Amino acid sequence: MNNPQPPHQPTESGTVRAELRRERAELIARFRERPEVHRLLTGMVRITNRSLITLWRDSGMPTDCCLAAVGGYGRGELQPHSDVDLVILVPDSEAVHRIKSIETFVGQCWDVGLVIGHSVRTVEQCLTEAAIDVTVQTSLLE
């Protein structure tokens, strides 16, 4: 059973896109002035987190779904031109076909300029895939 989420005012994707571009440009400009790699990579994560949280909330995802960062992004290091690796965890395999908000969320990510690599799986499917594919296992571990 889904718990109702508190009402909120959805954010325009154009606003998220503009904020994302501005924050990225500022971060890269600071990096050029003072090249601290760790600050750049973690700053990219922070900026991306903010955008994803807004888009996730605005897409109306059910509360029994979960967004997980994997790969380098999950490790807390995101290169400026890297894709954002995500797993959308759903409660059961049937949920994938009935959750329209997954399509909304993924589309909004692309619309605002986040290049995402994503999969939609149950926890059980993650474990099964990780057992047969070392790249999935590594990505989940990161």
What is the predicted function of each stretch?
Residues 13-23, 71-75, 123-124, 140-142:
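Short, functional N-terminal and low-complexity linear motifs
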Residues 1-63, 81:
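N-terminal regions immediately upstream of nucleotidyltransferase
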Residues 38, 46-53, 59, 99-142:
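Conserved catalytic core of two-metal-ion nucleotidyltransferases
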Residues 48-99:
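Active-site nucleotide-donor binding segment shared across nucleotidyl transfer reactions
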Residues 35, 77, 82, 120, ...:
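Solvent-exposed, flexible loop/coil residues
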Residues 23, 40, 94-97, 101-102:
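Hydrophobic/basic alpha-helical segments enriched in Actinobacteria
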Residues 18, 25, 29, 68-69, ...:
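A sequence-composition feature that detects small, non-aromatic residues
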Residues 33, 40, 66, 71-74, ...:
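Preference for short coil/turn "hinge" residues that link or interrupt alpha-helices
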